[in-house]
C-alpha cells in the first residue's frame, strides 16, 4: 500500500560512474581470449506429478540469469517446459527464453474512493504486465568465465498513474561473468540495480513471492525502477561461497521522480545520462546458506547506499547527497519435507534508515512469517507480515506550515496467499490493513484486497 515518494534532486553528473564502468568493461574484454566455460546446472528436485516432458527443463534452467536476487520461475514450472522442442533447440545453441503475463487489481474494502485518487487501491486500481527474458551463453564466443548476455523487456499498464508509468521498457541489457565456480562475478550494462541487491522477493522465485520485502527507502534514495540505467557491480564470495561482498555503481533515478525518469529516458529505456541524476553507489555484505537436508536456509545482508545527487532539504536549502542503510535477514525456522528441503516455515526481518531532513520515509522495521509449501501443496506460499514506517517530522512540519495535514508514521498488516492453479499459473491474494496510507494529506485507515494472476511460459 505504501507509495514510493517523489524525490527532488538538483542536477549532477555520472562521469565518475561511467569512467569506472568503461575501465571494467575493457579489463573484462581483455581476458576473453578464447576462454570457454559451461554454465552450472541447478539440481533442484522435480515434482513427481509433472508430465514426461519436464526432466529436460533442468538443462534449460542452467541458462537462466545468474547471480540475481529476483530469480525467474523455473522453466519446469512454465505452461510448456519444452515449447514443442523449441527450448531444446535454443539451448543447443546457447539461448534461453522465458516470458510471462501478470494481471492484477487492488480494491479498498472500506469504500474510501476519492477524486483525485491519492493511493493505490483507494479507487479500484488495475495493472497488467507482459515480459520476456532472454539469455545467451557468451562463453561460446570467447568470453572468459561463465558468461551471459541478459535481456529483459516488458510492456506495462496501470490505471492509476501514481503507481507506475505505462508503456514499453527494456529493464535489463547486461553482461554477467562468473569465475572460480561463481565466487567472483562482474556484471556491466543496463539494469535495475534493485534486482542485484537487498532481496525484495520472498520465496524461491519472483513469481511465487506473495508480498515481498517492502521498503520505500532504497527507491526514495535513488534506486531506479521501471526502466534501466547504466550500471556495474562486482560480487566476491568466500571459498565456501557463504560470505560475500557486493559493490555496485549506477545512475540515480531522475530528480523529479519515477514518472519524470520514465519521460526523460528514451523509448528503449537505455539513455546513458539524464540531467540531474547523479551516480549512486551501494555496498552489501552478506552470509547465505541454501536449504538442504539437515541445513536450514539463511540469508543475512546489510548494505549502505550513497547518492551523490543534491537533494532538496525540508528545512530549507539543499543537501549534498543522500544515503541509506539497511539490514535484512531470512531464516528457515524448520523444514516440513526432507525430500524438498526448501519447504518449511521462515521468518524475514528488516530495518531501513535514511536521514529525515531530506527523505519522507526516514526509517522502517518489519517482520514477515511465511511458509513455502503449506498444506501438502509444495508450490503454494503463505505469508503474514507487519511493517512500521517512521516518517519525517521535518516533512510533516513543512506540510502543516503550508496548510496541509500530515502524519509522522504508518503501519501495515498483510496476509497473503499464493495458490498454484496449475503448472505456470498462479493466483495471489492479499488482505492488507494500513494506518496512514500516505504521508500527506492524512487519510483514514485503508483495508485493501489485492488479487493477481500470473502466467509463465
Where would I find each of the regions flagged by the language model?
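Outer membrane beta-barrel
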Residues: 123-254, 359-366, 373-398
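Detector for outer-membrane/organellar transmembrane beta-barrel domains
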Residues: 290-400
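N-terminal periplasmic/intermembrane-space "pro-region" immediately following the signal or transit peptide
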Residues: 2, 7, 32-104
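Short loop/turn motifs that connect adjacent beta-strands in outer-membrane beta-barrel proteins
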Residues: 38-41, 74-97, 109-110, 135-149, ...
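Transmembrane beta-barrel strands of outer-membrane/channel proteins
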Residues: 99-107, 149-155, 186-192, 245-251, ...
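Outer-membrane beta-barrel "beta-signal"
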Residues: 445-457
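Membrane-embedded beta-strands of outer-membrane beta-barrel proteins
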Residues: 132, 173-175, 232-234, 283-285, ...
Amino acid at each position: 500500500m505504501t507509495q514510493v515518494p517523489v524525490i527532488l534532486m538538483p542536477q549532477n553528473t555520472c562521469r565518475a560512474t561511467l569512467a569506472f564502468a568503461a575501465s571494467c568493461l575493457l579489463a573484462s574484454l581483455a581476458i576473453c581470449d578464447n576462454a570457454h566455460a559451461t554454465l552450472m546446472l541447478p539440481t533442484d528436485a522435480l515434482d513427481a506429478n509433472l508430465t514426461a516432458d519436464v526432466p529436460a527443463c533442468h538443462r534449460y534452467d542452467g541458462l537462466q540469469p545468474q547471480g540475481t536476487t529476483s530469480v525467474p520461475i523455473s522453466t519446469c514450472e512454465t505452461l510448456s517446459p519444452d515449447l514443442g522442442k523449441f527450448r531444446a533447440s535454443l539451448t543447443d545453441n546457447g539461448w534461453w527464453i522465458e516470458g510471462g503475463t501478470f494481471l492484477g487489481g487492488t480494491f479498498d474494502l472500506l469504500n474510501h474512493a476519492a477524486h483525485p485518487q491519492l493511493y493505490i487501491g483507494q479507487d479500484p486500481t488495475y495493472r497488467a504486465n507482459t515480459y520476456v527474458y532472454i539469455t545467451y551463453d557468451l562463453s561460446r564466443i570467447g568470453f572468459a568465465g561463465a558468461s551471459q548476455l541478459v535481456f529483459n523487456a516488458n510492456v506495462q499498464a496501470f490505471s492509476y498513474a501514481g503507481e507506475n508509468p505505462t508503456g514499453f521498457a527494456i529493464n535489463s541489457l547486461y553482461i554477467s561473468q562468473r569465475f572460480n565456480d561463481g565466487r567472483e562475478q562482474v556484471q556491466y550494462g543496463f539494469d535495475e540495480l534493485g534486482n542485484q541487491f537487498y532481496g525484495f522477493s520472498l520465496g524461491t522465485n519472483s513469481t511465487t513471492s506473495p508480498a515481498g520485502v517492502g521498503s520505500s527507502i532504497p527507491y526514495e534514495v535513488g534506486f531506479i525502477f521501471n526502466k534501466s540505467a547504466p550500471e556495474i557491480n562486482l560480487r566476491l564470495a568466500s571459498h565456501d561461497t557463504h560470505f560475500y561482498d557486493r559493490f555496485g555503481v549506477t545512475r540515480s533515478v531522475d530528480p523529479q521522480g519515477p514518472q519524470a525518469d520514465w519521460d526523460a529516458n528514451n523509448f528503449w529505456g537505455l539513455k546513458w545520462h539524464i540531467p540531474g541524476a547523479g551516480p549512486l553507489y551501494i555496498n552489501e555484505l552478506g552470509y547465505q546458506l541454501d536449504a538442504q537436508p539437515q541445513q536450514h536456509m539463511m540469508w543475512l545482508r546489510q548494505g549502505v547506499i550513497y547518492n551523490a545527487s543534491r537533494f532538496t532539504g525540508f528545512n530549507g536549502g539543499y543537501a549534498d547527497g543522500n544515503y541509506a542503510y539497511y539490514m535484512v535477514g531470512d531464516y528457515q525456522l524448520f523444514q516440513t519435507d526432507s525430500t524438498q528441503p526448501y519447504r518449511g516455515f521462515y521468518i524475514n526481518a528488516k530495518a531501513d534508515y535514511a536521514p529525515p531532513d531530506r527523505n519522507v520515509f526516514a526509517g522502517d522495521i518489519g517482520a514477515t512469517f511465511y511458509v513455502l509449501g503449506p498444506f501438502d501443496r509444495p508450490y503454494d506460499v503463505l505469508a503474514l507480515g507487519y511493517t512500521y514506517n517512521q516518517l519525517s517530522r521535518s516533512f510533516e512540519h513543512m506540510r502543516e506550515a503550508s496548510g496541509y495535514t500530515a502524519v509522522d508514521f504508518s503501519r501495515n498488516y498483510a496476509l497473503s496467499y499464493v495458490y498454484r492453479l496449475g503448472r505456470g499459473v498462479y493466483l495471489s491474494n492479499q488482505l492488507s490493513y494500513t494506518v496512514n496510507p500516505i504521508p500527506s494529506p492524512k487519510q483514514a485507515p485503508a483495508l485493501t484486497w489485492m488479487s493477481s494472476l500470473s502466467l509463465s511460459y
